[in-house]
Amino acid sequence: MPEQNRESSLVLIKPDALKNSLTGYILSQFAEFHTGLRFAALKVVAVNLALAEEHYAEHKGKFFYASLLEYIRGYLHYPDEPSKRRVIAIIYRGPNAIKQIREICGNTNPHEARAQRPGCIRALGTVIPLYDKNGKFIGDRSDNLIHASANAQDAEREIKLWFLPTDIPPTVRSYPAETSKEYYYYKNGAVSAEYVPGSYCFIGPGDLVWKSDMKVLRQITKGKKQDYSTNAVIAKY
């Protein structure tokens, strides 16, 4: 089977889409009947700060970064309803999944999405003006309802960030995993292979872990340069 026919993409149905009861509409746009795409995995996630920071790491330092973290964590759309602060995370798999999904979603800016493709999902989104503490306009934040992986490299990083291997049936798991033989503990931003008072065990012998995550954990405990951040491993636990 050609590789593009087994392509995977992460989709996040964001809090503004949930607030506006657009979940059913969004899922219908990706229906297998129309796209040939299938669910590989789906879960509802209460987004912690580490997960939000890692997902939007490329935007760190930008004027809208703090607002973006509050947005994806549901604080902006559910300020007084903590139980409703969640995201629906989905892995779609199938022919040209990344390209198909991004075309259905439309431009990341809702204004541009409406102008370019009025029927796309993000055409229903909004653009929110942002102001500094003195009330000065500093730019916009796009509340665009949905996230979709931009390319194959991003899809792999994002799927491994939002999902554990055990969240995905083996027959549709796109990336290699391995069974841990060691314990790993976490406390205050640090990972160790031995228990430290106040730390907690997040991986133990017998746990199925992404192979790339295991490599990073071994790099950490051996004091070697990491392939990617500790946060990217910890955020999903």
Short names for language-model regions:
Residues M1-Y237:
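Non-catalytic terminal and connector segments of soluble metabolic enzymes
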